[in-house]
Amino acid sequence: MPDVFTHPDKTLDTQGLRCPEPVMMVRKTVRHMEAGQMLLILADDPATTRDIPSFCRFMEHQLVAQETEQMPYRYLVRKKESQL
């Protein structure tokens, strides 16, 4: 099975940061990305297991994959397509 985390357009390492900093950094990073690009997020804050999926739902980005069984947690987010 191929590793979906291997070729993101950008990587954001939020390890060592605690809520709300990881989600704030994700939001800032995604804002500067093109629609459809993929962001790999590395995190070690347990709150991200709730916050990253909630952020994606609220902002309508796609949470393509998440791996939270071991550290660092990994999340792969696709920026939503532009709306006309």
Swiss-Prot record:
The active site is at 19 (cysteine persulfide intermediate). One of its GO terms (molecular function) is sulfur carrier activity. One of its GO terms (cellular component) is cytoplasm. Pathway: tRNA modification. Belongs to the sulfur carrier protein TusA family. Interacts with IscS. PANTHER family: SULFUR CARRIER PROTEIN TUSA, SULFUR CARRIER PROTEIN YEDF-RELATED. This is Sulfur carrier protein TusA. The lineage of its organism: Bacteria, Pseudomonadati, Pseudomonadota, Gammaproteobacteria, Enterobacterales. The gene is tusA.
